[in-house]
Amino acid sequence: EVEQILRNKQVFVCSLAFLGEGEHSEAFLVNRDIVVKLPKHRQASECLKTEMQVVKGLGTKLNVEIPNVLFQGAFFHEGEEYTYFGSRKLPGHSLNKKQFCALPKPILDKNAEIVANFLYRLHSEKNVLPIQREGDVLVHGDFSLNHLLFDQNQMVCSVLDFGDSHVGDFQEDFLYLLDEEDEEEFGADFGREVLANYKSISSCSLQGEF
């Protein structure tokens, strides 16, 4: 099915590997350098449309890599139209909670700064999605450890999966960061450090406006 869909985009498939799936979509690695996301249901197709709008709007404005849109298209399944898109494979590797929490404190401290900067920059973007209520911001919507990639120095270098992005309260992106009990997430100590950095950046920014 993936090869047939890509044939319409004149993408010649030399290699194809299943990367994984989430609630909304399945991801495939094509030719070792292109990630294609296919929706699993009708609502997921709408999420992919939002994701494309968000990553196109953000472009290179953030301090880490995010998906781009190399190509996009639609296919029909049982009479319904579904949207998909392809992006370049992002650099980095994933870490589970045990691996992440075992990082040296200076590395964790630096990662807390990187994450705080990413979230602040994301939340500061006013023109990617319509913001109608004062205080609302653009949120990632599913900011969890499994959506981060790390470079060879174990620093956050890429953020994945903007399919749940929407306009809402900035605290939504701290849900997993501040979770005390989730065995798959960052750990609340790290989350509190991120939040402290975030508030510091926000405070400096506000002071600069006066």
State each model region's role.
Residues G59, Q99, Q152, L160, ...:
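Short, flexible helix/strand-to-coil boundary loops that buttress conserved ligand/catalytic motifs
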Residues G92, S165, L177:
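Active-site loop signature of alpha/beta-hydrolase-fold enzymes
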Residues S203-F210:
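All-alpha amphipathic helical-bundle segments outside canonical DNA-binding/catalytic cores
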Residues L48-K49, E80, N153, Q171, ...:
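Conserved strand-to-helix beginnings and helix N-cap segments that scaffold or border functional pockets
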Residues E1-V13:
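Juxta-kinase regulatory segment immediately upstream of eukaryotic protein kinase catalytic domains
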Residues E172-S203:
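Active-site activation/catalytic loop segments of kinase-like enzymes and analogous catalytic loops
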Residues A17, E26-V30, V36, V128-F174:
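Active-site acidic catalytic loop and adjacent metal/ATP-binding pocket
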Residues S15-I131:
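ATP-binding pocket architecture of kinase catalytic cores
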